[in-house]
Each structure stands twice: as structure tokens, then as C-alpha cells.
């Protein structure tokens, strides 16, 4: 493939962009930003959207191409104003391993440890229970005004930006995505398009090729944090063995390997992390916040620690050293009851 600098500039038309992609040419940021703006405005046909997505996926997305999609999507989002430093802990999904809602539990634990968490998510796509599904099962209302969503963050230390509320223009992609029924670039945009413009993100990406690209886009946008992928295929920091981690800050990305055994965590299996429907996964959330030990707790604390490391990237030390300190903070959040208190307060606020 050729780079935008060496390739002829593709014209901002559907035939121009799709032809360039078929030829193996990388698009410029402005090209994909135009494409997404056109889609978000409802001015692209399902055939044009599908052709663009398939051609882009077949060529292989670049950081610049994803950055253009993200920029346009953020421009079309409903804005929300939440004060201070904010953190998102989120996975792209798509690992098809049907685990419990690890990132949702990790978000509660990180909030209990003092982080202001603004989680951006949706209903399940490839599993039985997405973050929105399990939060509803826990009693957190999602049919809130934007002002109420912001209030939850300010008063409870955590909130949830429901993707379909904050990105209504994304509805124009529904038909071609459903009919294609294969992953495309759009499956990876959620963690990069938090409408609260969070400063820090801990992002699990199951797709090994896409993970460093997500880190690259977030770095390009001035964010900081960690992108990770378990060697077992999980879109989480996994307790089953090593994970590859891409640490991004100050516009740069550094790849490294994290091994949970270095923190004294006993190896487990993906089967130990399997979940069920929203009601079953909500019961697991309550068990973990009540202090139940085992592989699920290990996974939750690891991912909460990743979030705490992400928002505190100025701290000194190796990734292992910083994870060790953050893991202890996450454990204290659960064992002191602070994480459970966060959920109780959030639920009550959302119902008031």
C-alpha cells in the first residue's frame, strides 16, 4: 500500500475513495473525515457505506484513516460537560468469548479508588450482556438527560454515556453494518469517541492488528493511557497469562508485555471468566463488590489498575511497578466497600 504523502490525493467522492482503497492506496485524514461527515449527515446510501467499509477493511486501516473517522464522529456527537480529569475503561468487544462484564466492574472499582470515570458504551453486540445491559440489571437508569448523566459523574464519581444517545447520527450506519455482518472499522470507534473528551483511557482491543492503531489514534488526539490485548484473545488485561500493552502519552506509543504472574496472580483460564445474560452478570458484579475472591476478581482488579495507571501516567517506575501500586489501590477500593458504595450512590442518583 502507499502512504498519503506518496499517493495521488483521492477525491472526496465515493467513487474516488473506494477506487483508491481498491488500488491499495491509503487515504488521508481529510478523506475519511469527509466520508464520515457524509455518512453522519445521512447523505450516503447503504451501498456507498458498505462499499467504503469493505474496501477499507480489505486494504487494512491506518492510524490516519481511523483518526479522520473519529474526528468526524466526535464533531457530530451530543456534547457533555464534566469537570476535571476523566477516565474511561472500555473494551471494543468482538472477542466472542462471552466473559462477565470485566470493564464495567473495573470502572466501579477505579471510581471507588478516586478516579472520575466516564464510561462510554452500548448494548451487547457479540456477547450476551454489554455494559448497558448489565448496568440496567443493576438498577442504573440509562434513559437520562445529558445533564443528569453529567450530574452522576460529579456526585457519584462515575457515569455512563450511552452511545446511542450521544451519537444519534451513527444510526445511519445501522443497515449496512447489520447486512454486512462482519467487523469493520466502525466496530473499533467507540473507545476513541467518548463524548466527554476523557483525558485518559484504558482500552481492551481483541483484534491484534487494530490494537496498536487504536493506541496511535488516541495518542494523536492528545490522550494518555493503555491499550491492551490478552494473549488469550481477550479484550482485557487477562489473568490467564501475558498481555501485550501499548502505552500512549505525549503523542507517542510504546509497546510492552505485562505478565500478571509478576504481581503474584495465579494463572486461570478463560472458562473461569465466562458470563451469562445481564441478570447473571449483574449478580457477579455484586459478588465481586462484596469481596468474592478468584479469577474474576483478579481480572477486575487488573483492569481497574490499568485505568488508575492510565490516569496517573506521570508516576515514575516501570509498567510492572505502577501496576503493582495501582492493583493495591484497586483491591483497597473493593475491600473497604468504596466500590460498592459508588454503585449504590450511582444507582440512587440515576433513579432520582
UniProtKB/Swiss-Prot annotation:
Positions of anthranilate 2 binding: 177
Pfam families: Glycos_trans_3N, Glycos_transf_3
One Gene Ontology biological process: L-tryptophan biosynthetic process
Alphabetical keyword list: Amino-acid biosynthesis, Aromatic amino acid biosynthesis, Glycosyltransferase, Magnesium, Metal-binding, Transferase, Tryptophan biosynthesis
Transmembrane regions listed in the UniProt entry: none
Cofactor: Mg(2+)
Residues annotated as binding 5-phospho-alpha-D-ribose 1-diphosphate: 91, 94-95, 99, 101-104, 119-127, 131
Entry's family note: Belongs to the anthranilate phosphoribosyltransferase family.
Residue numbers binding anthranilate 1: 91, 122
UniProt KW Magnesium keyword: yes
Binding residues for Mg(2+) 2: 235-236
Broad class of enzyme this protein falls into: transferase
Cofactor binding summary note: Binds 2 magnesium ions per monomer.
Primary role: Catalyzes the transfer of the phosphoribosyl group of 5-phosphorylribose-1-pyrophosphate (PRPP) to anthranilate to yield N-(5'-phosphoribosyl)-anthranilate (PRA).
Keyword Transferase: yes
Subunit note: Homodimer.
Residues noted as binding Mg(2+) 1 in the record, renumbered to the chain: 103, 236
InterPro entries recorded: Anthranilate_Pribosyl_Tfrase, Glycosyl_Trfase_fam3, Glycosyl_Trfase_fam3_N_dom, Glycosyl_Trfase_fam3_N_dom_sf, Nuc_phospho_transferase
Protein name: Anthranilate phosphoribosyltransferase
EC number: 2.4.2.18
Superkingdom in the source lineage: Bacteria
Pathway membership: Amino-acid biosynthesis; L-tryptophan biosynthesis; L-tryptophan from chorismate: step 2/5
Amino acid at each position: 500500500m502507499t502512504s498519503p504523502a506518496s499517493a495521488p490525493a483521492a477525491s472526496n467522492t465515493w467513487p474516488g475513495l473506494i477506487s483508491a482503497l481498491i488500488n491499495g492506496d491509503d487515504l488521508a485524514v481529510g478523506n475519511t473525515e469527509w466520508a464520515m461527515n457524509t455518512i453522519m449527515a445521512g447523505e450516503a446510501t447503504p451501498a456507498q457505506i458498505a462499499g467504503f467499509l469493505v474496501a477499507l477493511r480489505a486494504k487494512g486501516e491506518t492510524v490516519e484513516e481511523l483518526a479522520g473517522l473519529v474526528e468526524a464522529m466526535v464533531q457530530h456527537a451530543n456534547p457533555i460537560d464534566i469537570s476535571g480529569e476523566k477516565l474511561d475503561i472500555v473494551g471494543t468487544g468482538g472477542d466472542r468469548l462471552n466473559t462477565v462484564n470485566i470493564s464495567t466492574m473495573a470502572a466501579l472499582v477505579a471510581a471507588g479508588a478516586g478516579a472520575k470515570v466516564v464510561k462510554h458504551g452500548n448494548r451487547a453486540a457479540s456477547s450476551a450482556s454489554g455494559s448497558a445491559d448489565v448496568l440496567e440489571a443493576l438498577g442504573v437508569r440509562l434513559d437520562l438527560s445529558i445533564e443528569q448523566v453529567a450530574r452522576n459523574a460529579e456526585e457519584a464519581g462515575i457515569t455512563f454515556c450511552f452511545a446511542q444517545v450521544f451519537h444519534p447520527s451513527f444510526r445511519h450506519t445501522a443497515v449496512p453494518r447489520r447486512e454486512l455482518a462482519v467487523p469493520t472499522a466502525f466496530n473499533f470507534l467507540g473507545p476513541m469517541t467518548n463524548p466527554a473528551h476523557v483525558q485518559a483511557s484504558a482500552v481492551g482491543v481483541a483484534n491484534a492488528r487494530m490494537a496498536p492503531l487504536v493506541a496511535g489514534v488516541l495518542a494523536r488526539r492528545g490522550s494518555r493511557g493503555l491499550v491492551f490485548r490478552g494473549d488469550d484473545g481477550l479484550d482485557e488485561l487477562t489473568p490467564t497469562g501475558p498481555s501485550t500493552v501499548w502505552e500512549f502519552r505525549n503523542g507517542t506509543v510504546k509497546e510492552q508485555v505485562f505478565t500478571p504472574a509478576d504481581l503474584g496472580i495465579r494463572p486461570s483460564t478463560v472458562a473461569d471468566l465466562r458470563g451469562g445474560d445481564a441478570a447473571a452478570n449483574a449478580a457477579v458484579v455484586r459478588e465481586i463488590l462484596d469481596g468474592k475472591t478468584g479469577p474474576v476478581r483478579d481480572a477486575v482488579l487488573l483492569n481497574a489498575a490499568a485505568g488508575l495507571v492510565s490516569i496517573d501516567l506521570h508516576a515514575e517506575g516501570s509498567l510492572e511497578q505502577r501496576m503493582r501500586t495501582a492493583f493495591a489501590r484497586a483491591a483497597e477500593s473493593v475491600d473497604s466497600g468504596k466500590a460498592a458504595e459508588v454503585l449504590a450512590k450511582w444507582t440512587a442518583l440515576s433513579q432520582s
